[in-house]
């Protein structure tokens, strides 16, 4: 119930921001990223569960890490699928939400980022149904996964 309300609040915020967002790109995996939709400013855009499942299946088949479902300049909705690990990173101005759909992984956040590794961060296992909020300036990374799929929402920047 809380997760449903949180997702609804985030989706509503995305719709409100759409009217004010500027076009743009950026983010992880930009060179290999596929963009499905530009965010409409004059109507809602629905992405049913069947659409998301098909997107994740296509990503697995093509070995894609990130697909940008909605591009809105100052925000975006992405599907992400990681196998193994990815380099730790930190964003100056981006706020992130993760909504885990499938698989498990070790997520580390906080601490300091030095030479591509997080030192002094907090590790925990994330699993389907978990929601993670990562504010700007917080190092984060995923490791130890046989495969994790999650929705990733970016707000506030393009770094």
Feature annotation, model-predicted:
Residues 125-146:
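Conserved metal-binding segment of the jelly-roll/cupin
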Residues 1-5:
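Positively charged n-region of N-terminal signal peptides that target proteins for export
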Residues 89, 95-99, 123-124, 132:
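His/acidic/aromatic-lined binding-pocket segments of jelly-roll/cupin-type domains
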Residues 92-113:
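Short, conserved beta-strand element in jelly-roll/cupin
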Residues 146-159:
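A short hydrophobic beta-strand segment most commonly corresponding to one strand
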Residues 111-131:
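An anionic, turn-rich surface loop/hairpin at beta-sheet edges
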Residues 8-19:
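Bacterial N-terminal signal peptides
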Residues 20-88:
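A short, N-terminal "cap"/entry segment at the start of jelly-roll beta-barrel domains
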């Amino acid at each position: 119930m809380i997760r449903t309300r949180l997702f609804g609040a985030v989706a509503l915020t995305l719709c409100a921001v759409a009217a004010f967002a500027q076009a743009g790109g950026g983010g992880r995996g930009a060179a290999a990223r596929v963009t499905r939709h530009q965010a409409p400013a004059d109507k809602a855009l629905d992405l049913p569960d069947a659409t998301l499942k098909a997107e994740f299946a296509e990503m697995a088949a093509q070995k894609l890490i990130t697909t940008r479902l909605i591009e809105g300049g100052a925000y975006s909705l992405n599907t992400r699928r990681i196998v193994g690990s990815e380099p730790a990173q930190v964003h100056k101005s981006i706020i992130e939400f993760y909504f885990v759909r499938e698989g498990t992984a070790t997520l580390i956040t906080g601490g300091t980022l030095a030479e591509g590794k997080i030192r002094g961060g907090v590790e925990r296992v994330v699993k389907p149904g978990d929601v993670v909020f990562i504010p700007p300036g917080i190092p984060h990374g995923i490791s130890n996964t046989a495969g994790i799929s999650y929705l990733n929402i970016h707000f506030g920047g393009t770094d």
